[in-house]
């Protein structure tokens, strides 16, 4: 399998999980570095510059939430949270703090491997875009969107988006004015098929994060609108 030696940082206080993931991910071609707590994770992140972080929530010294917050201050690196079975609050909190996806413990290593592949592919390969913008720069009111460079500027100032946030925006602007259902968004952006029964609040949280970064008034959005009973749409205010 050709992966070009992407580097994964696995952060978990359980040594058995670290060893299993290090072995499995190394076998399929990734370079793996590990950390046993949040403080060590931040140190290793600065030293190793990984391409993706797998991050447990409950850890000593600094929990996964704290690590996620610190990483998001300086990086848009893909983050997958490991959360406890049935603990919906953990999942939502992690997403609100900037995680891109989550996997519920106990998990199948194959499931995590699939999520890693999907997240790296969708955040680092613009050719997978579902948009019809043909790589052009878009000016939408006070927003400038550079499709090729995957960058967004608001009133001339660059806004930091995670890879998944940009992919979500890219999908919405591909058919401006047309609503996308949450199921459509989950499939197009995250690669989740309907039979997976993924909590659709993953979409809601990412929409909320996008609004907080792009809208002039996030509580009364003009761009990313809710299509009641359906999902969300992007409205071109330049028209």
Swiss-Prot record:
Modified residues annotated as 4-aspartylphosphate in this record: 56
Subcellular location: Plastid, Cyanelle
Source organism, top-level taxon: Eukaryota
Presence of keyword Secreted: no
Role played: Probable promoter-specific protein mediating the interaction between DNA and RNA polymerase.
Protein's name according to its UniProt entry: Probable transcriptional regulator ycf27
GO molecular function: phosphorelay response regulator activity; transcription cis-regulatory region binding
Record has Transcription regulation as a keyword: yes
All residue ranges annotated as the Response regulatory domain in the record: 7-120
Any single GO CC term annotated in Swiss-Prot or TrEMBL for this entry: protein-DNA complex
One GO-annotated biological process of the protein: regulation of DNA-templated transcription
